[in-house]
Amino acid sequence: MTMGTGESIQQIREKLKGRPETAELERWRQDSRAGVRKLLETYDRKQKTQAEERERLERFQDLERAFWARGMDQVAGCDEAGRGPLAGPLVTAAVILPHSIWLPGLNDSKKVTAARREILYGEILEQAVSVTVSILGPREIDRLNIYQAAKTAMTLCLTHLKVRPQAAVTDAMPLEIPGMEVEDLVHGDSRSAAVAAASIIAKVTRDHLMEDLDRQYPQYGFAKHKGYGTARHIQAIMDCGPTPWHRRSYEPLKSMSLKEEGVSENQLLQLK
């Protein structure tokens, strides 16, 4: 041992995985062993990264904080996944986050890897005040058009949260909901933590549903393209015809003059 710490490198490594006392850190910094110095360098880098991420997440809630300052303590974010695909449901989510969050990597779902989205999904459900999810099937999308379907789904999500928000932020969707101040924000999922959280919940939920559909209809490749109009997907439609989950109002299906409607599979889930 060096400098009389009385601790092995392995013991120090284990303690650094938790929350070491300031006195312990100061003692270890006096240790001249190369292995201890390396452990502390790694620890310091991790602490710096976490501090920067906490600052980023705090800034990410600036929009919500403006509402809180006006006495609106419960602010929901709302976003959807699945406007553009030829097949599959439109999934919308609304999320109320607490005033203090620790959701490392939270961002617009399109900027987050699939693996990180899965982790964030669980962390959001654990930390959120309230979460709702709407699932609208192809028949409703065809009947309403995708814009009105998204508007309807967002309204349903925001009005069925178990904790009613005084304010809400949407990703570029203007809404009028009695008793709720709604701000529609372009690129809201990159500018509001609550909207970003909703985008993660919606995206992960929809991806799981498309993976389920892939098992039912393996020839279409739903697990890979998630219903978007890739060359393989369009070729599968031409070769095999549409499934009940294809949107009849989207090309090339619209030009096929199909008689049967798409499936009507609608759900409203209060996850928390």
Stretches with model-predicted labels:
Residues M1-A76, R83-K272:
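RNase H-like, Mg2+-dependent phosphodiesterase core
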